[in-house]
């Protein structure tokens, strides 16, 4: 990798140097009124719901309205006002984004997405749980394919979390919350300079949460420790170091089950709090990341940026779950009140190394102003040797010490209980009388499997030029992506697949008025299939990579003296080569490529202040995401799973600044999602609307807040796969918070 990087920069350096020489005669640009960062390494001091500038969509700082692609942002101020510290709560403020399930799993513009970035670099998601995000400055959602800059990403969009950076002023904020479901949360945010020259800055974010949740036997404990340092030896060089340690202790939630459901079965047939498991089940996850960034400004118009992120995820799992079948009696008849059970004991790790380096140059060619970016990035994902899975054998105990499916004709070979029924390997779960006590697992007959090591590597060279002329701005980007996937890495049975692609992006912005821009963009996407699908002979691969393309037009504007920002976007998005199960009764692992899926829609986002003391965040989406081509003719024309036609959200906050009510504030809002298809042909999730509100009181250095979520106590489901895996939203809950600022 280092050799490739060196060769690449030796090739492009003369061209950039030439461009820089030519730029010496260029007059100071429109940005001379403030010293712009070339990479995000310093903190944001704004305190609005509106975010004016972004790095995520272009890797250079640009005004959001100058980027020819929809970008939605949720700032820390909105997160704090809503007490939204998990991604599932945060994305309710973003058009076109909804939860696919109760996991770290979302739908963006109708397409499922698990790609998440941290400070513009790729992370590893544990999937099963959403971490506590007390260290996040803002969350940005880049709508549509972002592959031209980041390589293989999901077509619907990419979520980028930006960590809180050190500030050059001393500030200490302590927070404590208590609320429904025995929830307790404490937060600490410390920042300031470490020397008189303010060349060394620090920030430390701490968060701890303990909650029983509204689900039976599903308590969680979460801890986040996130220190950050910034070092600026000169006004041209800055180094930033971010460390994040995140720990989660809980249980793996498989969703609210309704076994034996038929078409029309009511989703409240079981309580939304109902779960299956044992008291000694656990899911322990640890995430550790280290991100170091360097930015150097050679001159006003020429800079270099490099950033590296090391991310590690560890899982330690023990769970009792159903094997999706009823127990049987001595006659082989099903007992619909007893579920067959199994256990999974798993240890696993995932590593990710992500590096990006690029030059940025400003220069002119005649009347054209260029903002050129040339870069290289490398990403390596690894599943190391040492992972293992121990799974209980499904079925009933035989007298010879093994486990098998019960056969009435061979009844004499099975161990029977006092009622003459076969004894299961793992005790059944009684649906009428649930038992969540501690289970004795030492007697289970299990099978152990070592996790196959895997490694995939992606690297790319990318070029981007933002060309300005008069009221026009043209964004041109091109990336060459190289992808290599190794299964059974470093073993004799190692298998390897390589794929590569050219990925273009072109967008145009027209400055209609000083405060309103209109834009259009065409962009392509690329996402290789996973190693397990490409080299496993049972699934029918290798398969072609996922490819996508998007056309988008829209308008962005700043209003009310730039206090309020709005975006309207219309898009057409296509994805090809989607993998789905072939439903082959002789080979349940076999997959097939569906063909094509298409999404069309319109999105509206509004964020900022209407008055100095009246803030608003609003979003609305109308879309249709359908399967357009499929090997199964009956699938063509169907809506995609968990892709609602309409969704939206609203949050309005009013703060009294004068008079006897000075310091008092109130907020109200909510969100809605219309009905959605699932993976089950007989289940459609109902739409829902949830109302929320909050009261605030601020005096001296203390701020008090009371948040009420789901005021009307509406039973609703945020996502789901089928009747056995439903994900209900929380019932009415209250949270009281106090902040003390020094």
Model-derived features with residue positions:
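Structural signature of Gram-negative outer-membrane beta-barrels, strongest in the C-terminal barrel
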Residues: 232-234, 350, 369-373, 377-381, ...
């Amino acid at each position: 990798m280092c050799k490739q990087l060196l060769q690449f920069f030796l090739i492009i350096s003369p061209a950039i140097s030439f461009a820089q020489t030519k730029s010496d005669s260029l007059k100071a640009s429109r940005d001379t009124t403030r010293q712009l960062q070339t990479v995000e390494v310093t903190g944001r001091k704004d305190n609005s719901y509106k975010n004016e500038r972004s790095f995520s969509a272009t890797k250079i700082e640009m005004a959001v309205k100058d980027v020819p692609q929809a970008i939605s942002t949720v700032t820390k101020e909105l997160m704090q006002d809503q007490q939204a510290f998990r991604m599932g709560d945060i994305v309710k403020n973003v058009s076109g984004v909804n939860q696919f399930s109760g996991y770290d799993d979302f739908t963006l513009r109708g397409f499922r997405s698990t790609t998440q970035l941290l400070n513009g670099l790729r992370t590893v998601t544990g999937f099963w749980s959403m971490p506590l995000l007390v260290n996040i400055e803002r969350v940005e959602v880049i709508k549509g394919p972002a592959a031209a800059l980041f390589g293989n990403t999901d077509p619907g969009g990419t979520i980028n979390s930006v960590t809180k950076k050190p500030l050059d002023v001393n500030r200490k904020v302590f927070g404590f919350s208590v609320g429904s479901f025995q929830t307790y949360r404490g937060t600490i945010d410390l920042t300031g300079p470490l020397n008189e020259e303010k060349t060394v800055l620090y920030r430390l974010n701490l968060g701890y949460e303990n909650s029983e949740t509204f689900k039976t036997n599903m308590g969680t404990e979460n801890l986040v420790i996130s220190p950050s340092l910034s070092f600026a030896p000169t006004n041209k060089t800055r180094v930033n170091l971010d460390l994040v340690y995140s720990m989660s202790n809980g249980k793996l939630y498989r969703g609210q089950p309704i076994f034996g459901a038929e078409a029309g079965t009511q989703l409240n047939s079981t309580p939304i709090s109902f779960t299956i498991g044992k008291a000694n089940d656990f899911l322990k996850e640890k995430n550790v990341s280290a991100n170091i960034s360097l930015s150097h400004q050679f001159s006003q118009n020429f800079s270099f940026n490099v950033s590296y992120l090391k991310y590690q995820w560890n899982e330690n799992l023990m769970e009792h779950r159903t094997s999706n079948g009823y127990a049987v009696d001595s006659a082989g008849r099903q007992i619909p009140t007893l579920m067959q059970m199994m256990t999974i004991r798993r240890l696993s790790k995932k590593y990710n190394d992500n590096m990006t380096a690029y030059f940025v140059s400003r220069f002119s060619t005649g009347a054209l102003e260029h903002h050129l970016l040339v870069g290289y990035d490398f990403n390596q994902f690894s599943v190391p040797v040492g992972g293992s899975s121990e799974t209980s054998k499904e079925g009933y105990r035989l007298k010879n010490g093994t486990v098998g499916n019960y056969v009435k004709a061979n009844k004499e070979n099975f161990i029977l209980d006092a009622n003459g029924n076969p004894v299961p390997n793992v005790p059944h779960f009684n649906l009428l009388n649930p038992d969540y006590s501690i289970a004795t697992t030492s007697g289970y007959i299990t099978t152990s499997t070592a996790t196959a090591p895997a490694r995939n590597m992606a690297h790319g060279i990318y070029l981007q030029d933002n060309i300005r002329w008069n009221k026009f701005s043209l964004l041109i980007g091109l990336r060459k992506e190289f992808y290599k996937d190794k299964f059974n890495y470093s073993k004799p049975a190692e298998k390897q697949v390589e794929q590569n692609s050219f990925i273009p992006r072109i967008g145009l912005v027209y400055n209609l008025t000083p405060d309103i821009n209109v834009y259009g963009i065409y962009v392509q996407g690329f996402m290789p299939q996973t190693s397990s699908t490409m080299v496993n002979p049972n699934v029918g691969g290798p398969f072609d990579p996922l490819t996508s393309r998007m056309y988008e037009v829209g308008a962005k504007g700043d209003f009310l003296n730039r206090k309020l920002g709005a975006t309207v976007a219309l898009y057409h998005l296509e994805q090809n080569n989607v993998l789905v199960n072939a439903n082959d009764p002789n080979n349940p692992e076999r997959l097939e490529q569906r063909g094509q899926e298409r999404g069309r829609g319109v999105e509206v986002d509004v964020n900022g202040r209407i008055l100095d003391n009246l803030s608003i965040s609003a979003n609305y989406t109308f879309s249709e995401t359908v399967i357009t081509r499929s090997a199964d003719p009956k699938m063509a024309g169907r809506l995609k799973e968990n892709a609602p036609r309409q969704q939206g959200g609203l949050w309005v906050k009013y703060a009294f600044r004068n008079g006897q009510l000075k310091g008092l504030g109130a907020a109200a809002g909510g969100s809605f999602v219309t009905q959605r298809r699932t993976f089950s042909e007989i289940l459609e999730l109902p739409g829902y609307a949830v109302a929320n509100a909050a009261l605030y009181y601020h005096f001296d250095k203390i701020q008090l807040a009371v948040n009420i979520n789901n005021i009307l106590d509406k039973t609703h489901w945020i996502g789901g796969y089928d009747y056995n895996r439903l994900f209900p939203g929380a019932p009415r809950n209250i949270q009281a918070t106090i902040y003390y600022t020094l």
